[in-house]
Swiss-Prot record:
Chain's gene name: gld-3
CDD domains (alphabetical): KH-I_CeGLD3_rpt1 (cd22441), KH-I_CeGLD3_rpt2 (cd22442), KH-I_CeGLD3_rpt3 (cd22443)
A biological process term (GO) from this entry: embryo development ending in birth or egg hatching
Entry GO CC: cytoplasm; P granule; perinuclear region of cytoplasm; RNA polymerase complex; RNA-directed RNA polymerase complex
Extra information: The deletion mutant gld-3 (q730) makes no detectable GLD-3; it is predicted to generate an mRNA with a premature stop codon, which should be subject to NMD. The deletion mutant gld-3 (q741) removes the fbf-binding site from isoform A, but leaves the gld-2-binding site intact. Animals homozygous for gld-3 (7q41) enter meiosis, but are feminized. In addition, gld-3 protein that retains its gld-2-binding region, does not have the dramatic mitosis/meiosis delay seen in gld-3 null mutants. By contrast, sex determination was not normal; gld-3 (q741) males produced oocytes.
Region called Disordered, residue ranges: 459-508, 602-711, 950-969
GO-annotated molecular function: polynucleotide adenylyltransferase activator activity; protein domain specific binding; RNA binding
Annotated segments matching region gld-2-binding: 34-81
Record's protein name: Defective in germ line development protein 3
Length: 969
């Protein structure tokens, strides 16, 4: 930690004012040394970015300033946050039945605080922000006038020109804004180029003369510019500020005398390059439909003005358009002045409707008109600070903008004063710096009719559109809400006019407001309605929803069933309403529907519809399905249908279907299911948990499998250890070095396979398993009374267990769970192929899941066989490791991992078999066992017990006889 300063010590940084310069000036090296000394005293260091700011402070403001677009975005976020809180408060008062206040404190607006938009050449921004020795730059003007000046964002070329490429905004009190405008114009730079091709003095003598005789407030330098014929021509570049224009003219005339001596100077010896925003080319240069303005300037100034040919601004590439003016020094600067007078200027401000000289009607606030006598364009729209719903004591807010040319700024200020009410006792500024402009009498009368100027002071249309949609929805609900009298509100039918609603408050007569006029908030209490009325609305809603699904809509929107009460759930004789949220204000809350759950609506949005047969099947099937019989996270109980839906044994899962074709799971009977076959058979695969898995990374999802199994992937890299053995207690083997590439079946058997226990939190409602009717077998349902020990899990048992599985076929991994239903019908046990089972009953209780607990299963036949994903890893139980030792598996230190994992399972026992030997033994065996999904797990255990008894009888007979003899004595 650095040194801590005492509280009584004077903190120089705390009292530092960036706009107040010290009496003593320091050069860049001295400032940098002082900064390094101050940093080292506090055990800090000066970064490279800070060094650049200290050495070149003018670059800091230009590169790191708050852009105008950032300010607009901040205002939009502020307004959206405010409006959301306001509407939430109104909804809460309605839900609690409390009276609404007459007004709610809003964002304060001041009509005397305006935003002025002007055009400045972007090529001089770096000079405008620099000090230049006289302490006048953008920062000093901001401090002097108490305004906020924002340079435009760095423009990026696009298909259409950027209207804000050179637009500078000045925000503040209208009197201060005009002072800042004049200071910015006075400190604006310009550059003229002097041709040296016809001079009488040698170039090196001129360069020496310029270095030895500098001119105050004028910068001169030499530049080389190639001509069209390839010859390089040298020019003298002269740069100054507008306020130093007289000094530049005197310097240019003196140079003419020195260079040409007694001979007269050429007439067109000076050139000026003026940059213009391409968006305003038609408004500055003119067009064939209005008038060509550059010939007027040429006649008045006897100059030559040239510019690239154009038809319209959209055909001109780039955001900057260059105009070239050639003539003597006086005429060139005069022509520049006339061109600048044609630059667009606008002023924006927010104002209450009651603060206007003539308040407008709410429905007629979208105004765009031209005042012919003053040449001003007035545009008014609803303000972005106006809430969507106004209370009884609140007034509408307007956003007004006045637009014209820069030479007409005096009339623009006058129009601004006339818009405001007389209660604002002030006099608008009357600048006289454009009184001598030629455009007061030379500009055609119809030139401003096609004038258009976007300005930064107006926020983007996105906010206005959001409020327009919000108010339109509220107005539509108030018009089409369920009312006994069927009354509708009349609104003016204007094209761009904004529909508006007023929220009733306690001061108004609440009896005249319909009960369903306002959107029900998401936390509203239930609304009780007579039972027969609600049943009628349920039928109408179901019919409307069916029609919506026939048209291919993803789900009903709250705005589409305004004619009905809020959606309901019918349960016996009790009827409760599920309120919904406003779709604009509460955009983050999902829409809840009693008949269509939230997860069902998501299914349609995520569902593929690329196949024509798939879409046709959906349109036929969707209207007839009973959504009340589908499980949903939005309802508390699930009532199964009387006719359960038939499903195939091995159905393609939703997540497998959405991934690549190689990852689809193959059925046990060898039939590869595809998308068309599944939908033709009418199967549903829309489950919420699968869509939750879709949000994961696809590669990570296939690494971990459906429930944590690494072998769900069909495209695993052979030479990659995709599982952390220390974390999951998986035993990894290895063998000698590789000499040839593995075959397809070796790739499938390269990895370690595990038969493990499922977790007891897996049930049908949560996992949505696929079921298939299996033949009933009563002869093999009994379980041996003898206990099962650790010797149960052996290689021979696994051979018999997997004898009927075709391991050579990729993607075939049988996973079976036998479903037993007890006689009383109160509970159901699901027993997997590892011998563990779970009980699913009304109490949601789960019994112990060990091998001994299998004895508790009664003599019940198999009713269904269920394909279930792998359960999550449980380290409390042993695992059977099926591993094929080949010469391709000695990769990435498998020997160390194998040694570490030998003691990770139950009782420090791992059972390993060679799958290739297993396949060979199955092929050589003449015994044909039935398919594994047609057998009970008790059959497998009984056969295993017999095999163990046959193998151990010879080794234990002697020991048993000795024990019997000792016990007889």
């Amino acid at each position: 930690m650095g040194e801590q300063s005492h509280e009584k010590d004077h903190d120089e940084a705390h009292s530092y004012n960036p706009f107040v310069r010290s009496a003593v000036e320091y050069d860049a090296d001295t400032r940098l040394q002082m900064a390094e000394n101050a940093a080292s005293a506090r055990k800090l260091f000066v970064s490279s970015a800070l060094k650049d700011i200290i050495v070149n402070p003018e670059n800091f403001y230009h590169d790191f300033q708050q852009s105008a677009q950032m300010a607009e975005d901040a205002n939009q976020r502020r307004q959206v946050s405010y409006n959301t809180k306001r509407e939430a408060h109104i909804h809460q008062l309605k839900a609690q039945g409390l009276p609404l206040p007459s007004n709610i404190p809003m964002i304060e607006i001041n009509p005397t605080r305006v935003t002025l938009n002007m055009e400045f050449e972007s090529q001089y921004y770096s000079l405008m922000t620099s000090d230049n020795g006289d302490h006048e730059n953008v920062a000093s003007i901001m401090a002097e006038t108490n305004t906020l000046i924002q340079l435009p964002d760095r423009s990026v070329g696009g298909t259409t020109p950027d209207p804000f490429a050179q637009q500078v905004t000045i925000t503040g009190y209208f009197g201060d804004v005009d002072r800042a405008r004049m200071l910015m114009r006075r400190n604006c730079h310009f550059t003229v180029f002097m041709a040296l091709s016809k001079m009488k003095m040698p170039l090196h003598e001129l360069q020496a003369h310029v270095r030895q005789n500098p001119i105050q407030n004028v910068e001169m330098s030499f530049v080389d510019a190639p001509e069209k014929n390839g010859i390089v021509t040298t020019y003298l570049r002269i740069t100054a500020r507008e306020k130093n224009q007289h000094e530049l003219i005197e310097a240019a005339k003196r140079l003419n005398e020195i260079l040409f001596r007694e001979s007269p100077a050429p007439e067109n010896n000076f050139t000026l390059h003026f940059t213009l925003s391409t968006y305003y080319v038609d408004q500055v240069l003119g067009s064939s439909s209005t008038a060509q303005l550059m010939p007027v300037i040429e006649r008045e100034t006897t100059t030559i003005i040239s510019y690239p040919c154009y038809n319209n601004r959209n055909e001109t590439r780039g955001n900057i358009y260059e105009i070239k003016v050639v003539g003597n020094i006086d005429n060139v600067l005069k022509a520049r002045r006339y061109i600048m007078d044609l630059l667009p200027i606008s002023m924006c401000f927010n104002i209450k409707n009651t603060d206007m000289a003539e308040p407008s009607r709410v429905s007629d606030r979208n105004i765009h008109m031209i005042i012919d006598e003053s040449g001003i364009i007035l545009k008014m729209t609803p303000s972005v600070y106006e809430p969507a719903d106004l209370l009884s004591g609140e007034v509408p807010l307007n956003c007004a903008s006045l637009r014209s040319k820069e030479f007409n700024i005096k009339k623009l200020y006058t129009a601004y004063q006339k818009v405001l009410s007389k209660k604002f006792d002030f006099i608008a500024p009357q600048p006289n710096d454009y009184d001598n402009s030629i455009w007061h009498h030379s500009l055609p009368a119809n030139f401003l009719k096609n004038f258009n100027m976007p300005c930064r002071g107006e926020l983007s249309d996105g906010s206005n559109g959001r409020r327009h949609r919000s108010s339109s929805i509220a107005s539509s609900r108030s018009k089409h809400s369920y009312m006994s009298k069927g009354k509708q509100f009349s609104e003016s039918s204007g094209g761009p006019s904004r529909s508006h609603t007023r929220v009733s408050s306690f001061s108004e007569n609440s009896s005249t407001v319909p009960i369903m006029q306002f959107p029900t908030p998401h936390f509203a209490p239930p609304m009780l309605t007579p039972h027969h009325h609600m049943l009628k609305y349920v039928y109408l809603q179901q019919h409307q929803q069916a029609q919506t699904f026939l048209k291919g809509a993803a789900g009903l929107h709250p705005g589409t069933h305004i004619m009905f009460p809020p959606p309901i759930i019918v349960d016996g004789s009790f009827v409760s309403a599920l309120p919904f949220a406003d779709p604009v204000v509460f955009d983050g809350f999902p829409y809840v529907h009693g008949l269509f759950p939230v997860n069902e609506a998501e299914q349609h949005r995520n569902h593929r519809e690329s196949s024509p047969s798939l879409r046709s099947t959906q349109e036929i099937r969707k209207p007839s399905r009973n959504m009340g019989n589908r499980p949903s996270s939005s309802t508390g109980s699930y009532y199964p249908s009387t006719t359960p839906r038939q499903r195939v044994y091995e159905q393609v899962r939703e997540d497998d279907l959405r991934s690549h074709i190689g990852s689809r799971r193959t059925s046990v009977n060898g039939d590869d299911q595809n998308v068309e076959s599944m939908h033709d058979q009418g199967y549903e695969r829309q489950y919420p948990r699968q869509h939750q898995r879709l949000q994961k990374d696809d590669q990570q999802r296939w690494k971990t499998g459906s429930r944590g199994d690494i072998h769900s992937s069909r495209t695993i890299n052979v030479h990659r250890d995709v599982r952390n053995s220390n974390e999951y207690d998986f035993h990894v083997g290895n063998s000698g070095p590789a000499k040839r590439s593995p075959s397809l079946e070796q790739v499938q058997l390269q990895m370690t396979h595990h038969l493990k226990l499922k977790s007891n939190d897996v049930d049908l409602d949560h996992e949505k398993l696929y079921m298939h009717e299996s033949p009933h077998n009563d002869s093999d349902t009994t379980v041996s009374a003898s206990g099962f020990g650790n010797d149960l899990m052996d290689g021979d048992f696994v051979q018999r267990f997997l004898s009927n599985a075709n391991i050579n076929e990729s993607g075939r991994r049988p996973r079976t769970v036998s479903c037993f239903t007890e006689k009383d019908g109160q509970s159901a046990r699901y027993i997997d192929s590892d011998g563990a089972y779970s009980v699913v009953d009304h109490a949601s209780t789960h019994q112990s899941r060990s091998y001994d607990s299998f004895r508790k299963v009664g003599d019940n036949g198999v009713t269904k066989t269920i394909l279930e994903p792998r359960a999550r890893v449980e380290k409390d139980y042993g695992k059977i490791s099926l591993e094929h030792k080949t010469k391709y598996s000695n990769e990435y230190g498998d020997e160390e991992k194998s040694a570490e994992n030998d003691t990770s399972s139950l009782g420090s026992r791992q059972y390993r078999i060679d799958p290739m030997k297993l396949i060979a033994s199955v092929r050589e065996s003449s015994e044909q066992l039935p398919r594994i999904h047609e057998r009970q797990f008790s059959d497998v255990l009984n056969e295993k017990e017999k095999e163990i008894a046959d193998k151990s009888i010879e080794s234990t007979v002697t020991q048993d006889l000795s024990l019997d003899e000792t016990s007889t004595y």
